[in-house]
Amino acid sequence: MSDSDGKKTLGLRGSGSRPGNVKQSFSHGRTKNVVVETKRKRVVVPKPGAGKGGAGGVAAGDASRRPAGISDAEMDRRLKALQAAKAREAEEAAQREAEEKARAEERERRRAEQEAKEREQREAEEKARQKAEEEERKRQEEAEAAKKRAAADKAAAAAPKSDAGVAPARPAPGGAPKPAAGPRKAEREREERGRGAKGRNDGGRRSGKLTLSQATGGEGGRQRSVASMKRKQERARQKAMGQVEREKIIRDVQLPEAIVVSELANRMAERVADVVKALMNMGMMVTQNQTIDADTAELIIEEFGHNVVRVSDADVEDVIKEIEDKEEDLQPRPPVITIMGHVDHGKTSLLDAIRDAKVVAGEAGGITQHIGAYQVTTDSGAVLSFLDTPGHAAFTSMRSRGAQVTDIVVLVVAADDSVMPQTVEAINHAKAAGVPMIVAINKIDKPAADPNKVRAELLQHEVIVEAMSGEVQDVEVSAHTGQGLDELLEAIALQAEILELKANPNRAAQGAVIEAQLDVGRGPVATVLVQTGTLRQGDIFVVGEQYGKVRALINDKGERVKEAGPSVPVEVLGLNGTPEAGDVLNVTETEAQAREIAEYREQAAKDKRAAAGAATTLEQLMQKAKEDENVSELPILVKADVQGSAEAIVQAMEKIGNDEVRVRVLHSGVGAITETDIGLAEASGAPVMGFNVRANASARNTANQKGVEIRYYSVIYDLVDDVKAAASGLLSAEIKENFIGYAEIKDVFKVSNVGKVAGCLVTEGVARRSAGVRLLRDNVVIHEGTLKTLKRFKDEVAEVQSGQECGMAFENYDDIRPKDVIEIFEREEVTRTLD
């Protein structure tokens, strides 16, 4: 017996993996060899004593093992840093472990919820199945009982026919009759089939996945998918529950003036295909993206059994609610003071003296071009908000807006100039707005100052000052010397105290746009005076036809602020476009609401402009076209720095002209002159007027290439005068006749090659060859024309003086007689100008 008997040969064996070949079988006799390899996880056991050395060991060792050049303090510092790093790593590891634990708990919780849900679903399915089986069992029992009753009746009927001597059959041993075993056996078979079906269904969920046992077992190919099994279970559950139809929900459907079919279906919670089908049944071949009118949509809504709620497009503005503030919520607010008066009466200088800042230096020619909004704190601590309006005749609308948003009007009248046209206009604005007025008689330091004359002239406009037993306060001031400024501030504070101005700062902000402009670096910027509430950075708002989100708030000192309360003027950044001066700013809850309101207002404005420009009848259209034929137009483009200036220029242009010529503003806007403006001007043959703005480089190059004229202005008077002069050039010249002489015909001669020649005596003035003539017979004009020839004796002359005789022949006219009178005149063209 050798050593190898009964023993295996020694050899190497891989410890990391155990490969093996298995044969996988598929349908139709297909097979496939699969290599199955199972790997063991390698466990690394740390060596004894490992990890105990390291930086700490080196640090704890003697100085000979320490790196050269490192002191004890440096080594201690490094040790502390190393310990801190280790502590930080331990803390991070603990944090990661806690996060992982929390995630594991969350996964476990979700898994438990999923299992509970599946368990409830299985229980419901099991109850439904048991109920169905119970009903089936009862039905079969009833059928078996009916069969037994029928068999018993049949046996009873056949019993009398049988032989009476035959003994009845002995019952089979076992006691119970044989047919009674039938129902129990059928019931056991059904239970076994049910248990078998349940087992198959439970295992069928994973039957579509290949497992190792299936691969080694060599059983058939791929089974039904999990999704298929879920669909089958859902169908079985619905069948067991009897497919109970859900109760139809009646909805209140908001119906605008026009609605898209898909949106209508969405609001009714109905299928789009059903809505389209209903419309087609009504004879409307539409798709889901087409718009239908409100009446048709109402019929569809009623057909589907819902309620109709008709709404208007204007209802989008209902989100801007007028909140009635409670008395306990109101808090005192600073007064808003608007300074008004005639141009150059010292309004800005007066405010400059109050603010102790140089505002006048920034205005072109010392004339205010647009509204300035400032806040001033007096020596007594009172805060006043001032609005400085322009005094030009062109800025009527801006002064009107200033009066509408103000609490007190300070009417500035120069003591040496008294009441002027814009002073009267400011008085009317203040009366129309119903705000109290304080008269500031300025320039009292000038030698020609006469305050009593100002007070007397104000009486003509129903402004009775206190010095004349009235109720209007008047203060004599001098912006140059500072005289009377304290008295003016006291008068303003007294008037504000009488008014008891209050507002609620703890609500959504509402304000008025004082001015708006398009800044090159900041985009659309609006100067807003907050009237109630508090405007904060990040608020979503709608203002006129524009909307936006407050990106930044800048006060009158140029500083960024987080919020602005009542009576505080601020610049608002973040608009999507430049609003109109005078628009109301309202804060909304969402951007969608703001956008919807702005779009509605824009569409309403377009419809209004289209309706205003459209002729109502064909006769009106023809009449307008006939009038336009006789009118010459001067087209211009206007670009200004702020919205108020552009508006004032357009209004001034509309006033220029008469029945023969007018100025047409093709486009007015805010911001720099762009290449688009040049293209429009070139197509229309119009010049571009820039007010406090300039053209960019590309616009200048395009203007030079296309020959478009660009004019820059900083004072509105210069712009108006230039446009008026250009419009005057379109007027046809006026023809003026100057009578220079009379001549009487003494005799008529016939001259060959000339025709009839009149022998005349110049009785008055002078007769000129180049002048026009009229032939008068019995003081009736029978011919008007020119002279063919004018001779003295036989010589052709240019003119003949009074008392001399001459020969005259008319151009293309020979019906002349003795004693006719010739009237001699000259025509002169006189250039006309617009008033």
Swiss-Prot record:
Record field: compositional bias (Gly residues): 50-59
Residue ranges of the region described as G1:
341-348
Q: Which InterPro entries match?
A: EF-G-like_DII, IF2_assoc_dom_bac, IF2_II, IF2_N, P-loop_NTPase, Small_GTP-bd, T_Tr_GTP-bd_dom, TF_IF2_bacterial-like
List all Low complexity biased stretches. 153-169
GO MF assignments: GTP binding; GTPase activity; translation initiation factor activity
Chain segments annotated as coiled-coil in the UniProt record: none
Basic and acidic residues compositional bias, start-end: 86-152, 184-205
On the tree of life, the source organism's domain of life is: Bacteria
Locate the tr-type G domain: which residues? 332-500
Q: Which Pfam families match?
A: EF-G_D2, GTP_EFTU, IF-2, IF2_assoc, IF2_N
Chain segments carrying region G4? 442-445
Annotated region G2: the residues are 366-370
Which residue stretches belong to region G3? 388-391
The record's keywords, sorted A to Z, are: Cytoplasm, GTP-binding, Initiation factor, Nucleotide-binding, Protein biosynthesis
Region described as Disordered: spans on this chain = 1-240
Residues annotated as binding GTP are: 341-348, 388-392, 442-445
Q: Name one GO cellular component term.
A: cytosol
Where is it localised? Cytoplasm
Q: Where is this region: G5?
A: 478-480
Record family assignment:
Belongs to the TRAFAC class translation factor GTPase superfamily. Classic translation factor GTPase family. IF-2 subfamily.
Report the function annotation for this chain: One of the essential components for the initiation of protein synthesis. Protects formylmethionyl-tRNA from spontaneous hydrolysis and promotes its binding to the 30S ribosomal subunits. Also involved in the hydrolysis of GTP during the formation of the 70S ribosomal complex.
Q: Which HAMAP family match?
A: IF_2_B
Identify this protein by name: Translation initiation factor IF-2
Which organism was this protein described from?
Answer: Ruegeria sp. (strain TM1040) (Silicibacter sp.)
